[in-house]
A protein has these predicted regions:
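Conserved pre-motif I regulatory segment
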Residues: 2-72
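ATP-binding Walker
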Residues: 77-78, 386, 405
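Walker B catalytic acidic pair
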Residues: 199-200, 386
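SF2 helicase motor core recognition
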Residues: 381-396, 416-418
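Pre-Walker A (Motif I) flank of P-loop NTPase domains
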Residues: 59-60, 64-70, 97, 315-318, ...
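Conserved SAM-binding loop
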Residues: 19, 101, 320
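Conserved SF1/SF2 helicase motif Ia
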Residues: 70-77, 84-110
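Helicase-associated low-complexity regulatory tails and linkers flanking the ATPase motor
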Residues: 28, 93-96, 110, 120-137, ...
């Protein structure tokens, strides 16, 4: 127990921060590991691994040149809040004051910076904690060039960097800085208590990124991801340093996300369907789901609003996932044609992919970032691959994967983009608490996975698309 912060046990931190069960479990595992291992710079990694492996056999290798452990948490459970809990615990109980948070892309970097630094932000992770008389000092971007870090008032320094910028700026970061009296890299690597926190850590397994992090010589690495897999050629290799796993199926079962539903048809045999014919049917069935959901969300908000406590109306959108840019162009042309709902979505559809340039990219990206806004006209987003990690949208209700949902992992990743709860918790209304995945051509695969018991659809339902035109006849069939 810390003499300075005796109150700050894992239970106390969990209560003040309103942590969920998997977050508290992760925090307690960190406590057990850190108190069991002689945590210090230059420690015997083999002995440390032996201790951790004895407690958590799934951890058989740190996989880095420093002690690093992975916590696998499903999308939407709250990885950023858990980071805040890790920082609060390590500071109050182990006097650790330097944290380096790594983001995989600009979107997540901006989100982390906002959630860790802006105490006016509703998602500020340290809200309620009284252990920081002066807010933790955030060092990001080019702060290392023009600020004297040692002069900051706060005891705690949180460095936040996008891995791409960190890799590209490597040469500059290794140059001597007059304010530091050393290079930024050397300054960091000389810190006796630097803890590395890696968000979406499956992105930092490539040789260049991994070595850049190894060169920081941190005391400890804490990895957070929902996808503990590394692609090696044609194979996906599981992480070897996992100490805790909370899968998507468990998050759904525990009510921390919306419930996925598979949409299919029982009145048509798809065996002789061509690709375009099947695409058109899935798009039309998808938009029927979208329109029905839009109506149900409006009804829910109206029925549950009072003058004292109005309930906002959630504006849903539909995501169409295409196999490549040519396919996306064909889909966009079809959706904007009179053949698709008489052209009703002509001005409510955007396409986002890497080949777009200039003004088109900026305009569509702006609309995508703002897709939760009720005044945003977009109701259909056409995307190659899928919405990237970091798009924390809570109004994606219908997902139409065209020629792309070939594997269980891909289906889970797609559905994962639409699991966040728009009201922060389940409402008890089946339609408000659902996300739809059209699965006409993969329904038998989904059914087989469900029967094995390891699918995100195992406790879910099937919606028969042929019933969508008659809402009162919609059947929710247990898988």
């Amino acid at each position: 127990m810390s003499e300075r912060f005796p109150l700050y046990t894992t239970n106390y931190i969990g209560g003040v921060m309103s942590l969920r069960k998997p977050q508290i479990a992760s925090l307690k595992i960190l406590e057990e590991i850190v108190t069991s291992v002689n945590l210090r710079k230059g420690m015997n990694l083999r002995a440390a691994l032996g201790s951790v492996h004895a407690m958590y056999p799934t951890c058989s290798d740190f996989e880095r040149e420093f002690m690093s452990i992975t916590f696998v948490l499903a999308t939407g459970v709250g990885k950023t809040r858990l980071m805040g809990a890790f920082i609060a615990y390590l500071y109050t109980q182990h006097n650790i004051k330097n944290f380096f948070v790594v983001a995989p892309n600009t979107t997540i970097y901006n989100k982390l910076k906002r959630d860790l630094s802006d105490n006016n932000n509703p998602k500020y992770v340290f809200r309620g904690l009284g252990c920081f008389p002066v807010l933790p000092q955030i060092i990001a971007d080019d702060d290392y060039r023009d600020k004297a870090i040692s002069l900051y008032d706060s005891e705690i320094h949180i460095f936040i960097y996008n891995i791409d910028k960190f890799n590209k700026e490597g040469a500059n970061m290794r140059k001597v800085n007059e304010l530091l009296g050393d290079s930024f890299y050397q300054y960091l690597s000389n810190l006796p208590d630097l803890v590395l926190i890696m968000d979406e850590s499956h992105h930092y397994r490539a040789e260049k990124g991994a070595q850049a992090l190894n060169d920081l010589h941190p005391l400890l690495g804490l990895e957070l991801t929902a996808t503990p897999l590394v692609t090696a050629g044609t194979k996906q290799v599981p992480f070897k340093n996992v100490v805790y796993e909370y899968p998507l199926s468990k998050a759904i079962e525990d009510g921390y996300t919306r419930t996925p539903f598979a949409v299919t048809r029982s009145d048509i045999d798809f065996y002789n369907f061509g690709d375009e014919q099947l695409d058109k049917m899935m798009l039309l069935d998808g938009i029927a789901c979208h329109e029905r959901t839009k109506g149900e969300l409006e009804v829910y908000a109206t029925n549950h609003s009072t003058p004292e406590k109005p309930v906002r109306t959630v504006k849903p959108f539909m995501l169409v996932v295409c196999k490549d840019t040519d396919h996306a162009a064909w889909v966009e042309n079809f959706i904007k044609s009179d053949e698709f709902r008489n052209g009703a979505y002509r001005n409510k559809t955007i396409t986002v992919h890497s080949r777009q340039k200039g003004a088109e990219t900026e305009a569509n990206t702006r609309l995508l970032l703002d897709v939760e806004n009720p005044s945003n006209p977009v109701e259909i987003v056409i995307h190659v691959n899928m919405l990237k990690e970091g798009w924390d949208v809570n109004n994606l209700y219908t997902i139409v994967p065209l020629r792309t949902a070939a594997s269980k992992i891909l289906r889970e990743q797609m559905v994962g983009r639409g699991l966040r709860l728009p009201y922060g918790e389940r409402t008890g209304d089946r339609d408000v608490d659902a996300v739809m995945l059209t699965a006409h051509d993969k329904f038998q695969d989904i059914l087989a996975e469900a029967q094995k018991g390891d699918s995100i659809f195992k406790a879910g339902n099937v919606i028969k698309a042929e019933d969508l035109d008659e809402p009162e006849e919609i059947t929710y069939t247990q898988l």
